[in-house]
């Protein structure tokens, strides 16, 4: 598989790319094609059949939208709250190919670079110094400044486009499916080290990293267990149970303080779990100076500690018989729950002050709160149908 990178001066002129809303566009309701959180979950992007829209979460408002004459995008990847986005065509009647990434500068209203491939792009991930393009069997890692190809990573079939990055400036970690079923490959670029984690017996369905890349949370296509790993040595630190029945996991989110984990699935419940691990210490990765921390010290910077300040996940009433009864009876179950529709995909993320934000492919936005001491059913604080908002910017 090869790729082509270009700096398309004059290829996509602003006037030919952006289009003011015509009367036909105003009459035709835009269809939601995709939703995606930005790196710190303060905003999310919605790809539509007409273009894309950007929403702020606290307070909730549409910050801007772009209507395009040639259809919409199936991938709209933000770079925190900056003016840079990665766009991949898709959706009804889109004229933009699904095999090309456009790097869009919204301040200049133009495409500043593009990446063309020979097969469909499954995902694009951004951090301030890297552009990562995910194909079904390969991942390309580029330097953001000069668009130089830095790494190529082979994976097993990856139709979901699974890949996640660290976002601290002093770490550079990438996690993706490995070459074997249930395997995850963790690249520590600063340490020039690869860690292979045998996470599940079934294929990987969902994964996420903490912002510093020290912790990895995973789920398989079975969808019953979520596991948390140390990315340095592959140690499993904790395992929690979503349920007994098979489920399709849509999202896994870790709170910034690494005390909570949220999971959404096709079962119509968003689960919150209490984590017993937290990050202690810092690493010293620098993109200029390379790895300033030894592998041993880096590994020691992550310790599994019991936190006395938060509640614990409930276990089975028969957990006293662990070792005698099956593993199920010693499982940790969710600490708090919120119920949504089972007929559409929902993606959860943590907000401030023990809140969770949930966005759905039906155009719904929920904000709910959970009790960090007692757990239980979460309370709904806000509901908005963001595709039908009247207060446009």
UniProtKB/Swiss-Prot annotation:
GO BP field: autophagy; protein transport
Tissues where this protein is expressed: Expressed in roots, stems, flowers and leaves.
Disulfide bonds, paired cysteine numbers: none
Any single GO CC term annotated in Swiss-Prot or TrEMBL for this entry: phagophore assembly site membrane
Transmembrane stretches, start-end: none
Keyword Repeat recorded: yes
Domain of life: Eukaryota
Localization annotation: Preautophagosomal structure membrane; Vacuole membrane
Predominant place of localization: membrane
Record's bilayer topology term: Peripheral membrane protein
The WD repeat ranges on this chain: 27-65, 70-114, 199-239, 244-283
Keywords, in A-Z order: Autophagy, Membrane, Protein transport, Repeat, Transport, Vacuole, WD repeat
Protein task: The PI(3,5)P2 regulatory complex regulates both the synthesis and turnover of phosphatidylinositol 3,5-bisphosphate (PtdIns(3,5)P2). Required for autophagy.
Family as reported in the entry's similarity comment: Belongs to the WD repeat PROPPIN family.
Assembly behavior: Component of the PI(3,5)P2 regulatory complex at least composed of ATG18, SAC/FIG4, FAB1 and VAC14.
Domain statement: The first protein part may form a beta-propeller domain involved in specific binding to phosphatidylinositol 3,5-bisphosphate (PIP2), leading to the association of the protein to the membrane.
The protein, known as: Autophagy-related protein 18c
Organism: Arabidopsis thaliana (Mouse-ear cress)
Top-level taxonomy: Eukaryota, Viridiplantae, Streptophyta, Embryophyta, Tracheophyta
């Amino acid at each position: 598989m090869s790729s082509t990178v270009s700096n398309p001066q004059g290829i996509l002129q602003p006037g030919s790319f952006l289009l003011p809303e015509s009367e036909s566009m105003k009459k035709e309701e835009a269809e939601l094609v995709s939703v995606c959180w930005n790196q710190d979950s303060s905003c999310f992007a919605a790809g539509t059949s007409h273009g894309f829209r950007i929403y702020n979460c606290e307070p909730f408002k549409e910050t801007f939208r772009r209507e395009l004459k040639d259809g919409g995008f199936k991938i709209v990847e933000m770079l925190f709250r900056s003016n840079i986005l990665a766009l991949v065509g898709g959706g009804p009647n889109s004229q933009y190919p699904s095999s090309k990434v456009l790097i869009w500068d919204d301040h200049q209203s133009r495409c500043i670079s593009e990446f063309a491939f020979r097969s469909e792009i499954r995902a694009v991930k951004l951090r301030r110094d890297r552009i990562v393009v995910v194909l079904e069997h390969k991942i390309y890692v580029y330097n953001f400044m000069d668009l130089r190809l830095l790494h190529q990573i082979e994976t097993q079939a990856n139709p979901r486009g699974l890949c996640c990055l660290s976002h601290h400036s002093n770490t550079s970690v990438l996690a993706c499916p490995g070459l074997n079923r249930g395997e995850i490959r963790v690249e520590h670029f600063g340490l020039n080290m690869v860690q292979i984690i045998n996470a599940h017996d079934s294929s990987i369905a969902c994964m996420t990293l903490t912002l510093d890349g020290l912790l990895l949370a995973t789920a398989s296509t079975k969808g019953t267990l979520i596991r948390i790993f140390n990315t340095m040595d592959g140690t499993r630190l904790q395992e929690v149970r979503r349920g007994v029945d098979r489920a399709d996991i849509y999202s896994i989110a870790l709170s910034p303080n690494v005390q909570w984990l949220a999971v959404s699935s096709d079962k119509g419940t968003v689960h919150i779990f209490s984590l017993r691990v937290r990050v202690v210490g810092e690493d010293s990765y620098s993109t200029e100076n390379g790895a300033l921390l030894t592998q041993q010290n880096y590994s020691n910077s992550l310790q599994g500690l019991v936190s006395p300040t938060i509640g614990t996940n409930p276990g089975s009433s028969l957990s006293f018989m662990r070792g005698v009864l099956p593993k199920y009876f010693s499982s940790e179950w969710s600490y708090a729950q919120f119920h949504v529709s089972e007929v559409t995909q929902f993606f959860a993320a943590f907000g401030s002050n023990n809140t969770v934000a949930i966005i759905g492919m039906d155009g719904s936005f929920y904000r709910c709160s959970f009790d960090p001491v007692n757990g239980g059913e979460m309370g709904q604080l806000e509901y908005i149908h963001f595709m039908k908002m009247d207060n446009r910017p």
